[in-house]
Amino acid sequence: MNRIGMITTIITTTITTGNGAG
């Protein structure tokens, strides 16, 4: 569960950064 949460956070951060940059 902890690993899933970390992966979700990384994916969310990546998407947010991509949208912000794009």
From Swiss-Prot:
One of its GO terms (biological process) is threonine biosynthetic process. The keyword Amino-acid biosynthesis applies. Pfam families: Leader_Thr. This protein is involved in control of the biosynthesis of threonine. The keyword Cell wall biogenesis/degradation does not apply. Belongs to the thr operon leader peptide family. It comes from the Bacteria. Keywords: Amino-acid biosynthesis, Leader peptide, Threonine biosynthesis. This is thr operon leader peptide.
